[in-house]
Amino acid sequence: MKKKILVAGGTGYIGSHTTVELQNAGYDVVIIDDLSNSNIEVLDGIEKITGIRPEFIKLDLKDKEGTREALKAHPGINGIILFAASKAVGESVQQPLKYYRNNVVTLVNLLELMPEFNIEGIVFSSSCTVYGQPDPENLPVTEDAPIKPATDQRRDHPRYYSRKRSVQEHYPALLQPDRCSPECRNRRIA
């Protein structure tokens, strides 16, 4: 039986390319996206490339009950890849509550619903911003690189953003400690 993956934010640039790769590798894909940073025509492009139109649900993942209903309607999801997040550093400083609601509430909702639907894994797309400015000898940046945000102390600096992103990476182990083995650690895609 084919594995089924939920790609949250799957009509965005990275999400759509990930969907193509998953479908080409033989996975069934369900996309949930609110289309706030993309458009529905992306599904046509995915279908043109792979020959398969992925299942699509237009939904804001901050809506926990709506997310629960979507998961009920699409049983058998094995894992989630989460790209549904706001990502502009400058805007996150200007509108921190908007970013908190979108990025943190979405992640927490999914983590809380995963046990209910026996979804075992989640890949959380982070940001290279958590690493700060890497030393040239440490390039390319790898997922085990030290977190070293910018040193500027002002709240409006990218350091503030990188701290928020770094904290989000630790939520899975905090919210599901009984499901996290010693191997349950962050794997960043830089």
Where are these regions (language model features)?
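Hydrophobic, Gly/Ser/Ala-rich alpha-helical and linker tracts in large acyl-processing enzymes
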Residues: K164, S181-A190
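N-terminal Rossmann-like NAD(P)+-binding domain of SDR-like oxidoreductases, especially those catalyzing
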Residues: M1-C180
